[in-house]
Amino acid sequence: AILASSGKKVLTNPTGSNFTRGVAASIVAGSTWSGKLDYDIAIIELDEAYAAKFVELVRPRASLILNVMRDQMDRFGEIDHTAQLLEAVVHATTDVVILNKDDKRVNALQSSTQAEVLFFGVSSKLRDVFRSDDELHGEIINADEYAIVELRSMSDEVITLYIDGKTYRYPLSLYGVYNAQNATAVTAMCFALGLHPKDIGRHISTVTPAFGRGERIYVGSKRVILQLVKNPGGFRHALLGGKSIDAHHVMIAINDDYADGRDVSWLWDVDFSSLAQSSIITTGVRAADMALRLQYDEIETLEYERDLKTALKTSLLLTPDDGTLLLYTTYTAMLKLRTLLSEITEVEKI
């Protein structure tokens, strides 16, 4: 969105479908009838496993590696294997690699490339918020590398970044603390691509949530917030962001399809204590598993209901007019929930 606002014609895969089929669909949709791609640049979000295959065919000029988290362990086996897949991406990159200095597995990838390496990160006072996977239940270790862009402070509406020796304040209209880190990473990439920090800030303030990532949908006067969750770190950040929302009801939708990850044991690595006083329904294929996980944190649910449509209907009834319903949901459940919501209200088409 930032590059598009700066005048670039950008090809991307906006639906969140980051397997081969999603990228291929975006390329086909963006092509002319003769197969030409009339764009200045392609910004592609890729699943780790498919990224390693993709770069065998198309070597990226630039790559951005945010973090390595336990995600879909049924596919990847263990987190160090995920890091090896990302190493292939870094090795294939020709011009510049942007790495998170605060994630030790990402940091270590700097030795795997001949391209220029730049780092982004957060200040030491924010490290407790943005813990790496090893630090979720362990000691925080600060890296020595210089960050070309560093997140110094954040609020619900403004982030302060230290960019190449100067301080900038950017308005941010994106829900969730994780978006402050995302904005930091994106700023580093845009800066590496030649955009001026003031231009980045002007454009980043206009970025709206990607669908399902803090997306707001209104059902009458009721506000529904869709928040995608898929690993311990992401769910932790989503819950931290949820503290600033006066949600009247919470629904947690957990599926275990291939795109979600069959193994949902990662739920046991999330601290759900912030939901202790919430009105909660769990739903999806793993509704009972989610309810059991909450019970171990001594959090009672109103009910667990596998059927998404029934659970959504009940949750909307439990949300008062002018109130907020907060939905934490895995990927395939999120797609279904957006479809269900589109049957009763206006939902942006992707």
Cite the ranges covered by each PLM segment.
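Phosphate-binding loop of NTP-binding sites
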Residues: 1-116
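Buried hydrophobic packing segments
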Residues: 3, 23-27, 183-193, 238
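Short, acidic/turn-prone active-site loops that include or flank metal/cofactor-
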Residues: 15-18, 67-71, 122-125, 255, ...
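Short glycine-/acidic-enriched loop or helix-start segments at secondary-structure transitions
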Residues: 22, 53-54, 74-75, 107-110, ...
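Structural beta-sheet core signal
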Residues: 44, 63-65, 99, 119, ...
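Glycine-rich nucleotide phosphate-binding loop and flanking beta-alpha elements
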Residues: 49-50, 70-72, 104-105, 126, ...
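Acidic, Mg2+-coordinating active-site environments of NTP-dependent enzymes
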Residues: 68-222, 301
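ATP-dependent carboxylate-amine ligase
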Residues: 188-198, 202-350
